[in-house]
Structure formats: structure tokens, C-alpha cells
Amino acid sequence: MILISQNITNYDIQIPENAVFRINLAWVNSINELKKLLELHKAHDIFLDLPINRTKPPNNRYSLEGIISILQDHNNVKYLAVSNVNKKEDLDEYITKIPKNITIVPKIESSIGVDNIESITNKLEYKERIIMLDHEDLYTDLLKL
């Protein structure tokens, strides 16, 4: 998978046809802006990053309930990254509510999440399981040990 950040749009760089376009909702200011981004990149599969319990700026403005209709209306959203997954139970609400055509990607940002990574991945019922490790937050947490 070639995963391209939304930051690439700040430069005059062509997005490869087979790339998955990542949109981090921490950097999207409104639902209307998200809809425009999804429409602009409708030719690409989308990896949507939903920051939950984000403590550093910019703070997340969205909840799962707030984006469910977006997920249902945009078939090109193929992945949803969920921040701060520390244990398998953190995924329960997402597994229940997210459309089945979207792959949930747990984002591990703490040593607790690393310790529970096997049970977290086993909770996912996909042929291919994807985990995202947040290098900055995870590194900061590991330094505290």
C-alpha cells in the first residue's frame, strides 16, 4: 500500500493513481471541508484518521457519531484509523458502528497499547490486519517508563 498524506497537496506533486490518500481529521476544520476533500480525491481510496482523546494541538473536533454519515456516503473511505487504542475493548464501539466495508486501523500511542497489541489485533476480524504506531506519542510515552 502506498499511503500519501494530505500534506502532499501543499506541493506540486502528483498523487500516484494507486495511492491511498490519508486525511487526518485533526487538520480538517469542518465537516464541509472534509466533504470537499473526499470529493476532490474521489478517485483514490481514503485512509481517514480520527484522533480520539488528542491532547496536543490541533484538537480533534469530531466524534464517531459526527462522521458516521460521511463514512456511509463515501464508498472510497476504505480505512479508519482510531487513535489511542490501549486495549481490545477500545475498538468495540467502532466495530459495532463502522460500515463493514471500512477497515478499522488501531493507532497505538502508548506502551500499554504495545503490551496489548496481540489482543488488539485479534479483535479485528479482517483477513489483513493493519496497526498504526504513532512514533511521536509512543516515543514520548516510552521515555516515561
Where do the PLM segments sit?
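Conserved alpha/beta-domain cores
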Residues: 2-145
